Amino acid sequence: MPNPQPSARVPRFSPLLREVGSCCLLTAALLLLFSCSKPEDFQKSLQGKLINAKSGDVIDLPEGKFHLDRTLSLTVNGVTIRGKGMDKTILSFAGQKTGAQGMLIKANDFVIEDVAIEDTAGDALTIQDASNITVRRVRVEWTRGPNSANGPYGIYPVSCKNLLVEDSVARGAADAGIYVGQSENVVLRRNHVEFNVDGFEIENTENVDAYENVSTHNTGGMGVFNLPNLPRQGGRHIRVYNNQLVDNNTPNFAPKSLGPIYYLPTGTGMYIMAIRDVEVFNNKIQNNNTVNIYIINYHTGVDEESLRDTAASPITQQVFAPDDKRYDPFVRDVYLHDNDISGGGQSPDNRVDGVKMLAAALGGKLPDILYDGVVDPGWGHKRPNPGQLCLSKNAAASFLNFDAAGGMHHPVRDVKRYECSLPALSAVAIPQAAAGGK
């Protein structure tokens, strides 16, 4: 019999495979469009997606560096913006023409992850009046390094509730790399901040857990404080633990127009001002040249040089001339324990009058932990520790209460007066931090 001829069969794909193939082609086309289109086309497309988004939408951004010249804004709840990685999807605002922020978010249930925001004219990522916010693996940076012309804030949530900022990076901010203000229920974890004026700022905020962060090579590592004349007062219940606040000795590059941050002494590890219920434990706080930890009331923090500059800008006028009767300027109920503190105060910043005067009185160096000793007159000065500052097991950290109210006439170096404990503060619980949280 003759050999049978090969069958001329045509391959067939199932409807499902055809759908998958079409989807892949569409995705590839979109990626090509994002990657190869003109910068203005990418910007227009992305802003259009943000304007037309619906709750539940995920806006995927491709790998690449994309140039934008105006603020991106979102006001729709329940949206996720997701890139391919903080060093792979880069939104560059170098040469920004319109708007101050890189991104301005006024929406609840918002997630942004795996994206970089670079070289904005003002703040990089601003989030306002929002609840249930997640910022994950986001890098904000001014790529020219420390410069007074950089934007003030990197990651900048204000008036938020249930906020998680994790695994993110901030570099080059002329005020704070990661700031949280007038907010409630906040977790800051595993972030890295460097070469900012202030690494972290926790301002007028209640219920915060800040842990496993690294703050290094900033002017100051972390500030925890309340300021007057802001809508929300009474920030408290702050836990700072398992962090590294080390080598924060970058010269202060904030412009005077930004107000108080201009006076932050170079070489400040952590400062705690005008706030209560703060627990600081299991941290490494080392080699900050002015002081490792500075605990002060508001009026000590605002030195004479600052007061002379109240007319410099509306910011300084508001902060340095407070008339807020709701405001409590005193610090109390602060518990520092089980920290590794050493090497602070070796080369204090003489640019700031108050630091210069204090260092001169102490022979040119400052202790690791510096406390002004100022308390509310109503607390009873006959008690040995009316402000309830408690210190315990902080390695061999040196200490001084420099008696600011008494003109430094009765300083106290003996830390034993402050060896006590306070009840541990409870953990901050927010839904999005539950996985892998502490």
Predicted region positions:
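C-terminal motif of bacterial Sec signal peptides marking the signal peptidase cleavage site
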Residues: 33-35
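Extracellular beta-strand/beta-solenoid scaffold signature
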Residues: 46-47, 69, 93-103, 119-126, ...
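Acidic, glycine- and Ser/Thr-rich low-complexity intrinsically disordered tracts
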Residues: 301-438
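Right-handed parallel beta-helix/beta-spiral solenoid domain characteristic of secreted/periplasmic
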Residues: 37-44, 58, 78-122, 144
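Glycine-rich repeat segments that build the extracellular carbohydrate-interaction surface of secreted
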Residues: 49-68, 79-84
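Cysteine-centered motifs
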Residues: 23-24
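Right-handed parallel beta-helix
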Residues: 62, 84-87, 108-119, 131-144, ...
